[in-house]
């Protein structure tokens, strides 16, 4: 009986210890959660992220509503919101924009480029597979551009196209009847041929967008207009060639960008990746 009583006493003590340990763990978690939520994380937890990474991948569109399932796309609306948020976040010391895009809507690319220029934190563009057309336009908004030797860079040009169903309609016996108010209202209608006057009208706008692109590259990259004009034939070039003509600053990858932040800006980078 004495042994049984001792055993019961030991079990009671063990149970009480277990309960107290559980209560202690609960309050420890509550205290940690309280301080994580309500204190300056940079002081309490030195591992707090201090460098934002924004990915600009695929086709560049203007709004989130334009994003389609199954397609790799980035909306300028979202990226600009991220950059505005970063500007007001004292924890973030620098921004890396990872680019793998061959362009998209001109206004969308310009919006992101201008938002980068407005950003008060140091900015670095890292071109992965491709930074061409609108993708390159975004890159020039950054303080510094890195790319791989194998990256496809440039394509400082503008393209516009339209469909022409006139021969197909003729073969199928379809007759096109036009009812239009306004001389150029149906310009680009695929059911009739484009007139020479309409072609000139469209080329006027294409050339104007091209000129703006050239001027932005020259201004933001510190290049002569004449230099950019020679490069602005719509072609792309590899990383080493792009560096030689001033389209990028350095050959490197994410580790090289992080080292640049350490060496030049005295930032020990802890990355936070924004996901769209």
Which sequence ranges carry the predicted segments?
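N-terminal organellar transit peptides
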Residues: 1-125, 130-134, 144-147, 160-276
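Active-site loop architecture of trypsin-fold serine endopeptidases
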Residues: 150-158
């Amino acid at each position: 009986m004495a042994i049984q009583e001792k055993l019961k006493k030991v079990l009671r003590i063990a149970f009480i210890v277990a309960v107290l340990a559980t209560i202690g763990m609960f309050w420890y978690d509550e205290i940690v959660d309280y301080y994580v939520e309500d204190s300056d994380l940079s002081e309490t937890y030195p591992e707090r992220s201090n460098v934002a990474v924004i990915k600009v991948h695929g086709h560049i569109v203007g709004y989130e509503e334009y994003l389609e399932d199954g397609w790799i796309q980035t909306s300028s609306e979202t990226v600009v919101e991220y950059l505005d948020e970063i500007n007001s976040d004292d924890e973030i010391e620098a921004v890396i924009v990872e680019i793998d895009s061959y362009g998209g809507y001109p206004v969308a690319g310009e919006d992101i480029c201008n938002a980068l220029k407005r950003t008060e934190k140091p900015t670095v563009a890292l071109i992965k597979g491709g930074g061409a057309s609108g993708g390159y336009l975004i890159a020039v908004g950054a303080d510094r551009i890195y790319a791989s030797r194998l990256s496809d860079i440039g394509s400082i040009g503008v393209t516009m196209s339209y469909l022409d169903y006139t021969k197909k309609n003729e073969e199928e016996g379809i007759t096109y009847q036009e009812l239009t108010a306004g001389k150029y209202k149906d310009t680009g209608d695929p059911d009739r041929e484009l007139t020479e006057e309409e072609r000139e009208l469209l080329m006027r706008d294409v050339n104007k967008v091209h000129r703006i692109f050239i001027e932005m590259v020259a201004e933001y990259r510190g290049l002569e207009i004449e230099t950019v004009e020679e490069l602005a034939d719509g072609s792309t070039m590899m990383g080493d060639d792009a560096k030689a003509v001033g389209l990028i600053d350095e050959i490197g990858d994410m580790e090289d960008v992080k080292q640049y932040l350490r060496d030049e800006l005295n930032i020990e980078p802890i990355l936070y990746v924004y996901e769209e």
